[in-house]
Swiss-Prot record:
The chain crosses the membrane at residues 19-39, 63-83, 114-134, 174-194, 211-231, 260-280, 288-308. It is found in: Cell membrane. NCBIfam families: PRK00068.1, PRK12438.1. The lineage of its organism: Bacteria, Bacillati, Actinomycetota, Actinomycetes, Mycobacteriales. It holds the Pfam family UPF0182. It is a multi-pass membrane protein. Belongs to the UPF0182 family. GO terms for cellular component: extracellular region; plasma membrane. Residues 913-946 have a biased composition (Pro residues). Disulfide bonds: none annotated. HAMAP family: UPF0182 (MF_01600). This is UPF0182 protein MRA_0066. Residues 898-948 are annotated as: Disordered. It comes from Mycobacterium tuberculosis (strain ATCC 25177 / H37Ra).
Amino acid sequence: METGSPGKRPVLPKRARLLVTAGMGMLALLLFGPRLVDIYVDWLWFGEVGFRSVWITVLLTRLAIVAAVALVVAGIVLAALLLAYRSRPFFVPDEPQRDPVAPLRSAVMRRPRLFGWGIAVTLGVVCGLIASFDWVKVQLFVHGGTFGIVDPEFGYDIGFFVFDLPFYRSVLNWLFVAVVLAFLASLLTHYLFGGLRLTTGRGMLTQAARVQLAVFAGAVVLLKAVAYWLDRYELLSSGRKEPTFTGAGYTDIHAELPAKLVLVAIAVLCAVSFFTAIFLRDLRIPAMAAALLVLSAILVGGLWPLLMEQFSVRPNAADVERPYIQRNIEATREAYRIGGDWVQYRSYPGIGTKQPRDVPVDVTTIAKVRLLDPHILSRTFTQQQQLKNFFSFAEILDIDRYRIDGELQDYIVGVRELSPKSLTGNQTDWINKHTVYTHGNGFVAAPANRVNAAARDAENISDSNSGYPIYAVSDIASLGSGRQVIPVEQPRVYYGEVIAQADPDYAIVGGAPGSAPREYDTDTSKYTYTGAGGVSIGNWFNRTVFATKVAQHKFLFSREIGSESKVLIHRDPKERVQRVAPWLTTDDNPYPVVVNGRIVWIVDAYTTLDTYPYAQRSSLEGPVTSPTGIVRQGKQVSYVRNSVKATVDAYDGTVTLFQFDRDDPVLRTWMRAFPGTVKSEDQIPDELRAHFRYPEDLFEVQRSLLAKYHVDEPREFFTTNAFWSVPSDPTNNANATQPPFYVLVGDQQSAQPSFRLASAMVGYNREFLSAYISAHSDPANYGKLTVLELPTDTLTQGPQQIQNSMISDTRVASERTLLERSNRIHYGNLLSLPIADGGVLYVEPLYTERISTSPSSSTFPQLSRVLVSVREPRTEGGVRVGYAPTLAESLDQVFGPGTGRVATARGGDAASAPPPGAGGPAPPQAVPPPRTTQPPAAPPRGPDVPPATVAELRETLADLRAVLDRLEKAIDAAETPGG
């Protein structure tokens, strides 16, 4: 039934139109409102941190990609739809029982433009939005330069493969998508309007449909020819020979590469055959051409390389792959900076030839041996330096060094941060959580080579106040008293790893002019944030935006928010760097330092590539577990540089990026893309540079590669006989590899303390020590790697063997049984240290933690014993084991009396300190070490003593120690009141 005049479209009543309009508006608000809020908040935040130009550049790049891809895809699809519609047959039988698409055809005919433009624009916008994620490739292509290194196969600069080729491939992929979508759109349109009919029993195709479909099919095949051409260059990153090596091998060069050229020619001929369908009605020629292309891809592109690999290459792989392995070695060394310009190799016997006390370098090394393990002591720091239930330290503490009174000392460091997860009761109220408990308080450090006192009584070790760190605290209280070993002028921490764990992560600071401070500072004082960081929410519009973003109406109605209020967001240092520099990959371990009286976080950042020709692939990131439980490997890269050192101010969140590698062409490209965002290396303050550490993530990648790529000769590389392995962690039962460790050791030239990141390496599928790798962190030699290579037939034990030898020692085993009655045992870092002019000293701290059955009691680790071990010089692989409450005593056990004298003495007197948790004062604070400008002088060497006499002396010393222990207990009992 019709209403109104014939040909007139029905008109909705005004009320219905208003409802439809309102409904559409609400739908649009629900769909796009949250995204618009996020965009506005990002605009404010990037402006606050001073990196709005980055946000604008990325946004404009992505919008340009969306526009370009949408225009191309929509244009090609719309052209296909328009041509198919205009060339439709004039007469199409409209019988629903014989034509199932008749109803759809009628609907389209009523709104042909709506359907045509709607489909084309929708497909174009969707493709554009997906393509916008390739903005990195676009920027690298536009601003990329040269490396000054050419590939060994084609003779092109490396810049072509890493800057240009990925962009060309991306453009080609989207042209593929556009043409395939156009082909499908044309096919469906012709079918809808009768140009292609399948209901007549044998099918029917109009001339217009045949021509149009042939053109699009030919275009697809022509694009495939271009893809084959680009495939030639991507062979240089082939994974065919992995895990042996990466890059084009013999089969790739002598079979795959010619095959690609053959397939290019066949694809071009096939495309021409499709285009002939424009003039010829016979479709058998294009069909045969398509069959030829498929058959050629199988035979020429697949079977031929497979046969060559199986019957020609594999039987002679060591010889035929030799030049390609050489290419892989050279490219990998260049891509990861593990070549001769950056790595120094030295032969090392693995057996000591001198007493450590006679070697100045060893005197320094022993004096700086680290006994505190940052992986174990976080709970100890928290329990002894927490102050309040809502303060905490990171799960893993950090290691850094400071020069106090001229003496370089390494410290275990941590920041006393606010822990949002620790707030309880009324502390979790919105006002308290976000406006009162807003910041942490203080920088806490402990000398890494000493504790307050030695823990001696094994039976009552958990009841003693021994084996704890000696803290150097720089917080609000110490600022007022002027007692700071490491001076900090602003100890408040608004940005950190722990504080950012709030969900949602934000704090509201500031307030109305003249209002009283409300942020918790100490038990007797409040504070008002005065930093430059933070997004203003002093106006109602911004308050409304943030109320919408965090879904919290109290933003609008709270009287605590005034005209000067700010909201602090994105408080994780690593996240802040990632957001302002999205082209960088950040290290997983930011660490706090004190520079010019302020606490700042240092974040190591890397430039990476995944298409460096012939370079081995590796991952800077560990495996990632998805919410569904699927474990995926981290992003694979084939080039990495620690080109940027970033800092984040812990008080106001200021982010600063410093160039740290002037020779990195990738960083130079990004600095052209985002001018002014990265400061030059000349602007790095000396005080900040002194705290730069060689990053762990990079070192772990380099040591795993050096396990293979220290080999120069391709044939030896192929046999893997000379390979090394990263040792398993002997203190971890999860089959994890041993983490590298930061240590202060004596420098070979000056004997001064040198801060390094080091790792032992064992033989391939063996447990004996094969090498020792260390990376310099001192400004003068930063980045240099030193590799000590042991003989291939060495019997020097590796970490796992040493661990087994130490814990199976009769003294260790018997006392461990005693300790385990009431304690949990934690083994600390097993440190490997070059010593004794050719030997290796292993040092491992042993921590105990009282076992408690009460849920309200708190327990935390304390240093109880020190294990040391060295190879016995006069035996085939035998070892000496030292086990004592102090490092000095352990060293005397393995090297003889006198060596322990050069070890750092304990830092305090256990008799004068109250037990932890007893309500007394905190453990003793650190005192500056004595000032020295030269390494400690080695004590004079005594006469050589026969082994039998040494054994007798050790027994006598043990008896004397037992007598002294009984005497000390008697004196303590006599001095105790009432005793």
